[in-house]
Protein backbone atom coordinates (compact mmCIF):
# COMPACT_ATOMS: atom_id res chain seq x y z
CA UNK A 1 0.00 0.00 0.00
CA UNK A 2 1.27 3.47 -0.90
CA UNK A 3 1.82 5.79 2.04
CA UNK A 4 2.21 9.55 2.08
CA UNK A 5 5.90 9.12 2.80
CA UNK A 6 6.28 7.33 -0.54
CA UNK A 7 4.83 10.17 -2.63
CA UNK A 8 7.65 12.11 -4.24
CA UNK A 9 8.91 13.36 -7.60
CA UNK A 10 12.55 13.76 -8.55
CA UNK A 11 12.54 17.07 -10.42
CA UNK A 12 14.75 17.23 -13.50
CA UNK A 13 13.15 19.40 -16.20
CA UNK A 14 15.35 22.50 -16.02
CA UNK A 15 17.85 24.59 -14.07
CA UNK A 16 17.89 28.23 -12.96
CA UNK A 17 21.19 30.08 -13.25
CA UNK A 18 22.03 33.66 -12.37
CA UNK A 19 23.50 34.23 -15.83
CA UNK A 20 20.21 33.30 -17.48
CA UNK A 21 17.68 35.36 -15.52
CA UNK A 22 16.52 38.92 -16.16
CA UNK A 23 17.96 41.60 -13.84
CA UNK A 24 14.41 42.77 -13.13
CA UNK A 25 12.02 40.32 -11.40
CA UNK A 26 8.96 41.54 -13.30
CA UNK A 27 10.70 40.73 -16.57
CA UNK A 28 11.65 37.32 -15.20
CA UNK A 29 8.08 36.70 -14.05
CA UNK A 30 6.79 37.69 -17.49
CA UNK A 31 9.21 35.23 -19.08
CA UNK A 32 8.10 32.36 -16.85
CA UNK A 33 4.43 33.24 -17.17
CA UNK A 34 4.65 33.20 -20.96
CA UNK A 35 6.33 29.79 -20.75
CA UNK A 36 3.46 28.57 -18.53
CA UNK A 37 0.97 29.83 -21.13
CA UNK A 38 2.93 28.20 -23.96
CA UNK A 39 2.90 24.92 -22.04
CA UNK A 40 -0.91 25.19 -21.88
CA UNK A 41 -1.02 24.77 -18.14
CA UNK A 42 -4.55 24.87 -16.68
CA UNK A 43 -5.15 28.34 -15.24
CA UNK A 44 -1.54 29.46 -14.82
CA UNK A 45 -2.94 32.72 -13.42
CA UNK A 46 -4.04 31.01 -10.20
CA UNK A 47 -2.07 31.87 -7.09
CA UNK A 48 -2.25 31.30 -3.36
CA UNK A 49 -2.84 34.50 -1.40
CA UNK A 50 -1.75 34.39 2.25
CA UNK A 51 -2.86 37.02 4.75
CA UNK A 52 -2.81 37.52 8.53
CA UNK A 53 -5.87 38.55 10.52
CA UNK A 54 -6.19 41.00 13.36
CA UNK A 55 -5.85 38.07 15.78
CA UNK A 56 -2.51 37.07 14.24
CA UNK A 57 -3.86 33.92 12.60
CA UNK A 58 -2.81 33.28 8.99
CA UNK A 59 -5.18 32.20 6.24
CA UNK A 60 -4.69 31.30 2.60
CA UNK A 61 -6.84 30.85 -0.48
CA UNK A 62 -6.57 30.57 -4.25
CA UNK A 63 -7.27 33.75 -6.24
CA UNK A 64 -6.63 34.87 -9.81
CA UNK A 65 -3.96 37.36 -10.81
CA UNK A 66 -5.49 40.03 -13.05
CA UNK A 67 -2.58 42.36 -13.74
CA UNK A 68 1.19 42.58 -13.42
CA UNK A 69 3.44 45.54 -14.16
CA UNK A 70 6.40 47.29 -12.56
CA UNK A 71 4.11 48.50 -9.76
CA UNK A 72 3.09 45.04 -8.58
CA UNK A 73 0.61 42.16 -8.80
CA UNK A 74 -3.12 42.92 -8.96
CA UNK A 75 -6.15 40.89 -7.90
CA UNK A 76 -9.78 41.83 -7.23
CA UNK A 77 -12.13 40.81 -4.45
CA UNK A 78 -14.75 41.89 -1.94
CA UNK A 79 -13.16 44.32 0.52
CA UNK A 80 -15.47 43.00 3.27
CA UNK A 81 -14.43 39.36 2.82
CA UNK A 82 -12.10 37.65 5.27
CA UNK A 83 -9.11 38.48 3.10
CA UNK A 84 -10.26 42.09 2.90
CA UNK A 85 -10.57 42.32 6.68
CA UNK A 86 -7.17 40.70 7.08
CA UNK A 87 -5.57 43.20 4.71
CA UNK A 88 -7.23 46.12 6.49
CA UNK A 89 -5.68 44.91 9.76
CA UNK A 90 -2.28 43.94 8.30
CA UNK A 91 -1.62 45.46 4.85
CA UNK A 92 0.96 42.87 3.83
CA UNK A 93 0.54 39.66 1.85
CA UNK A 94 2.38 36.74 0.30
CA UNK A 95 1.59 35.20 -3.09
CA UNK A 96 2.58 31.81 -4.45
CA UNK A 97 2.40 30.60 -8.03
CA UNK A 98 2.91 26.83 -8.35
CA UNK A 99 3.39 25.44 -11.85
CA UNK A 100 3.98 21.76 -11.10
CA UNK A 101 4.17 20.74 -14.77
CA UNK A 102 7.21 23.03 -15.15
CA UNK A 103 8.51 22.17 -11.67
CA UNK A 104 8.45 25.86 -10.76
CA UNK A 105 7.28 28.16 -8.00
CA UNK A 106 7.27 31.94 -7.66
CA UNK A 107 6.95 33.41 -4.16
CA UNK A 108 6.12 37.10 -3.70
CA UNK A 109 6.02 39.14 -0.49
CA UNK A 110 5.11 42.79 -0.09
CA UNK A 111 2.81 45.50 1.13
CA UNK A 112 -0.76 45.94 -0.04
CA UNK A 113 -2.44 48.96 -1.57
CA UNK A 114 -5.87 49.32 -3.12
CA UNK A 115 -6.06 49.95 -6.84
CA UNK A 116 -7.57 53.22 -8.00
CA UNK A 117 -11.32 53.60 -8.42
CA UNK A 118 -10.78 53.86 -12.16
CA UNK A 119 -8.79 50.61 -12.27
CA UNK A 120 -11.46 48.79 -10.29
CA UNK A 121 -14.26 50.22 -12.44
CA UNK A 122 -12.54 49.23 -15.68
CA UNK A 123 -11.90 45.68 -14.59
CA UNK A 124 -15.38 45.24 -13.13
CA UNK A 125 -16.92 46.41 -16.42
CA UNK A 126 -14.89 43.78 -18.29
CA UNK A 127 -16.28 40.87 -16.26
CA UNK A 128 -19.07 38.59 -17.53
CA UNK A 129 -22.54 39.74 -16.55
CA UNK A 130 -23.04 36.80 -14.22
CA UNK A 131 -19.87 37.65 -12.30
CA UNK A 132 -20.93 41.29 -11.94
CA UNK A 133 -24.31 40.23 -10.59
CA UNK A 134 -22.62 37.73 -8.28
CA UNK A 135 -20.47 40.48 -6.77
CA UNK A 136 -23.67 42.12 -5.52
CA UNK A 137 -25.43 38.91 -4.54
CA UNK A 138 -22.65 37.46 -2.40
CA UNK A 139 -21.75 38.93 0.98
CA UNK A 140 -18.44 37.12 0.70
CA UNK A 141 -17.34 35.13 3.78
CA UNK A 142 -20.61 35.85 5.63
CA UNK A 143 -22.68 32.92 6.93
CA UNK A 144 -25.89 32.25 4.98
CA UNK A 145 -28.71 29.85 5.81
CA UNK A 146 -28.95 28.12 2.43
CA UNK A 147 -27.99 28.05 -1.23
CA UNK A 148 -31.54 29.17 -1.99
CA UNK A 149 -30.90 32.45 -0.19
CA UNK A 150 -27.91 33.16 -2.40
CA UNK A 151 -29.84 32.33 -5.55
CA UNK A 152 -32.73 34.56 -4.47
CA UNK A 153 -30.30 37.44 -4.01
CA UNK A 154 -28.83 36.76 -7.43
CA UNK A 155 -32.28 36.90 -9.01
CA UNK A 156 -33.14 40.13 -7.19
CA UNK A 157 -29.90 41.81 -8.32
CA UNK A 158 -30.47 40.73 -11.92
CA UNK A 159 -33.98 42.17 -11.85
CA UNK A 160 -32.76 45.41 -10.29
CA UNK A 161 -29.78 46.16 -12.54
CA UNK A 162 -30.47 44.24 -15.74
CA UNK A 163 -27.51 44.25 -18.12
CA UNK A 164 -25.54 47.04 -16.41
CA UNK A 165 -24.88 46.42 -12.72
CA UNK A 166 -22.45 49.03 -11.35
CA UNK A 167 -19.42 48.06 -9.33
CA UNK A 168 -20.37 47.50 -5.68
CA UNK A 169 -18.59 49.96 -3.36
CA UNK A 170 -17.24 47.04 -1.31
CA UNK A 171 -15.65 45.38 -4.35
CA UNK A 172 -12.36 46.35 -5.99
CA UNK A 173 -8.71 45.67 -6.50
CA UNK A 174 -5.58 45.23 -4.44
CA UNK A 175 -2.00 45.54 -5.58
CA UNK A 176 0.80 43.63 -3.88
CA UNK A 177 3.84 45.91 -4.08
CA UNK A 178 6.68 43.41 -3.69
CA UNK A 179 9.91 43.85 -1.77
CA UNK A 180 10.95 40.23 -2.37
CA UNK A 181 10.30 37.80 -5.24
CA UNK A 182 11.75 34.28 -5.26
CA UNK A 183 11.98 32.03 -8.32
CA UNK A 184 12.23 28.31 -7.54
CA UNK A 185 13.15 25.61 -10.02
CA UNK A 186 12.95 21.98 -8.97
CA UNK A 187 16.20 20.02 -9.32
CA UNK A 188 17.26 16.40 -8.72
CA UNK A 189 17.86 15.11 -5.17
CA UNK A 190 15.97 18.09 -3.70
CA UNK A 191 18.92 20.39 -4.50
CA UNK A 192 16.59 22.96 -6.00
CA UNK A 193 17.58 26.29 -7.55
CA UNK A 194 16.28 29.32 -5.62
CA UNK A 195 16.98 32.87 -6.74
CA UNK A 196 15.70 35.69 -4.55
CA UNK A 197 15.21 39.23 -5.84
CA UNK A 198 15.24 41.80 -3.03
CA UNK A 199 14.29 45.42 -3.58
CA UNK A 200 17.37 47.64 -3.28
CA UNK A 201 17.16 51.30 -4.28
CA UNK A 202 20.95 51.51 -4.53
CA UNK A 203 21.18 48.72 -7.09
CA UNK A 204 20.40 48.84 -10.78
CA UNK A 205 17.62 48.22 -11.77
CA UNK A 206 16.53 48.51 -8.13
CA UNK A 207 16.91 44.83 -7.17
CA UNK A 208 19.65 42.52 -5.94
CA UNK A 209 19.70 38.78 -6.71
CA UNK A 210 20.80 36.19 -4.16
CA UNK A 211 20.98 32.41 -4.38
CA UNK A 212 19.33 30.60 -1.48
CA UNK A 213 20.17 27.16 -0.21
CA UNK A 214 17.38 24.71 -1.09
UniProtKB/Swiss-Prot annotation:
Pathway: Cofactor metabolism; pyridoxal 5'-phosphate salvage; pyridoxal 5'-phosphate from pyridoxamine 5'-phosphate: step 1/1; Cofactor metabolism; pyridoxal 5'-phosphate salvage; pyridoxal 5'-phosphate from pyridoxine 5'-phosphate: step 1/1
Keyword vocabulary terms for this entry: Flavoprotein, FMN, Oxidoreductase, Pyridoxine biosynthesis
Keyword Flavoprotein: yes
Chain residues that bind substrate: 8-11, 66, 123, 127, 131, 190-192
Species this protein is from: Burkholderia ambifaria (strain MC40-6)
Subunit structure: Homodimer.
Cofactor binding summary note: Binds 1 FMN per subunit.
PROSITE patterns listed in its UniProt record: PYRIDOX_OXIDASE
Similarity-based family: Belongs to the pyridoxamine 5'-phosphate oxidase family.
Biological role stated in the UniProt entry: Catalyzes the oxidation of either pyridoxine 5'-phosphate (PNP) or pyridoxamine 5'-phosphate (PMP) into pyridoxal 5'-phosphate (PLP).
Annotated FMN binding sites: 61-66, 76-77, 82-83, 105, 140-141, 184, 194
Catalytic activity: pyridoxamine 5'-phosphate + O2 + H2O = pyridoxal 5'-phosphate + H2O2 + NH4(+); pyridoxine 5'-phosphate + O2 = pyridoxal 5'-phosphate + H2O2
Lineage: Bacteria, Pseudomonadati, Pseudomonadota, Betaproteobacteria, Burkholderiales
Protein name in UniProt: Pyridoxine/pyridoxamine 5'-phosphate oxidase
Cofactor(s) this protein cannot do without: FMN
Enzyme Commission number, as recorded: 1.4.3.5
Gene that this sequence comes from: pdxH
